[in-house]
Design a protein with these regions (language model features):
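Glycan-recognition and catalytic cores of secretory/periplasmic carbohydrate-active enzymes
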Residues: 1-125
Length: 125
């Protein structure tokens, strides 16, 4: 959480922090919201910790809704803009593909996060 920028949506790599010009990864934020909410529902956290993490997940989800969600089918071919899945760095050999676009897992976790936010989630696993 310490590496997240003010809008709570991480850069494509958590080594970057506030003020970086690197692209954001909305799909990582959507997956993180689901993971945080799952962690909070499984026990093991003190009430204060659980409240903190639920609030952080809520802030992250609100940012996705307000700043990253597609608002028109004319705008994009998915639900959540600004996802990343292949970004080059000194530590890998990939080409920049899938930077700043919608992706399948971002859309899936975004829908799951919205569902978890609206009602008690009953896992199907």
């Amino acid at each position: 959480m310490r590496h997240l920028p003010a809008d709570m949506v991480p850069y494509w790599d958590l080594q970057f922090s506030e003020g970086s010009s690197e692209p954001r990864d909305s799909s990582a934020a959507a997956a993180a919201v689901c993971g945080i909410l799952e962690m909070c529902s499984n026990g093991g956290l003190e009430k204060e910790e659980q409240s903190f993490y639920r609030n952080e997940a809520q802030r992250m989800l609100e940012s996705l809704i307000d700043k990253y969600a597609v608002t028109s089918s004319q705008e994009a071919n998915g639900l959540l803009r600004h996802g990343v899945y292949a970004k080059s760095s000194p530590y890998n050999s990939v080409s920049d593909r899938g930077v700043d676009e919608c992706n399948l897992w971002g859309d899936y976790f975004y829908l799951e996060a919205l569902t978890r936010n609206m009602k008690e989630w009953k896992t199907y696993w």
